[in-house]
Amino acid sequence: VIFEKFQSPALAGFAVVAHWVPFLLFSVHAGALADKFDPRRVIQLGMLFFVIVSLAWGFLFYSDTLEMWHAIVLLVIHGLAGALWAPAAYMLVHDIVGGEELQSGVRLTATSRTLGVLLGPAIGGGLLLLVGPAWGIIINAAIYLPFTIWLWKAPYGPAYRHKQLGTQHGRTQNELPTRAIRGFSDIFQTFKDVANNRVIISMTLLAGAVSLFVGNAYQAQMPEFASDLGATEATFRYTALLTAGAAGALAAGIILEIRSLMLPQARTAFVQVLLWCCLITGFALTNSFYLALIFLFFAGFLELSFNSMTQTLVQLRAPDQIRGRVIGLFTSSSLGLKTFSGI
């Protein structure tokens, strides 16, 4: 809808930058908020921003008053909401499933996100056709309400546990040691805090390298790849190329969960990344549509596997008092560096 109104490639590029830059700059700060305050409330704040953005889009579409600066502001707020949500969400997953089942929890979270990638365009397209862009995006805002309401009293999170302990043992949450939230110096301090932990540093750098040098850049170039493979836009073949990676990731989530495969080990993560690089290279070089489809499917399979593995290894080894900051540092690397994907 935005592209049809403005026909601006620059705005389309800004939408990508506005989505990833907040992860790069503010993930550690978002993690610090999750360390200091209740992660449930931090997630709710992020969802509130998403709801506000969706309602604003709906109003502007309905009133036909959308201007370029409106789009820029809303895209920035949307990116900030995602950066605010991510570290707190991973902290809450850790608290819900515990350390032993953490990889499973992270993997299922990634699988549900992949399912959203597969089904989201279909549902969004259906709403667009059924009720139009304005009411479609307003209905989208309502999707956040059930999770927001559940989080209000959800019996999970450090704040909930410490409240229970305070009731039973005469302690209060305020007595727990927390570090003050600083500016950008927090990023460097967090890096110093974990500098001696080889697993955290290596997994953070590995995830960052994947995002920086490849990331999702090949998705943006898919029209050119598809043209070389004889699959023009708006055809089944083009759609198959776009969704092959997500289908592979969904298969990974299901198969690895059923079989309890791929225990979190740093060496395994490195091997998977190397294999993933080979598959992406094969996709870029092949002239066969069917081989390209196979390469993308298995690349998606491995991507979900090594992403969940690196995330798990970092969370398991993060000190309790700064777990949010460490998760934020990892998120800044793994998601924030996608700003420069394919450099």
PLM region spans:
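MFS-fold secondary transporters
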Residues: 3, 56-61, 78, 150-151, ...
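Hydrophobic alpha-helical transmembrane segments
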Residues: 68-75, 79, 104-162, 243-248, ...
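Helix-loop boundary and gating motifs at the non-cytosolic
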Residues: 1-24, 192-245
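Conserved extracellular-gate-facing transmembrane-helix segments in secondary transporters
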Residues: 86, 117, 121, 210-219, ...
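Small-residue-rich segments within alpha-helical transmembrane domains of MFS-like 12-TM solute carriers
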Residues: 79-87, 215, 300-308
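C-terminal transmembrane bundle of multi-pass solute transporters/carriers
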Residues: 24-29, 36, 40-42, 49, ...
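Hydrophobic alpha-helical segments of secondary membrane carriers
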Residues: 108-116, 206, 329-334
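Juxtamembrane intracellular "pre-TM" segments in multi-pass secondary transporters
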Residues: 156-205
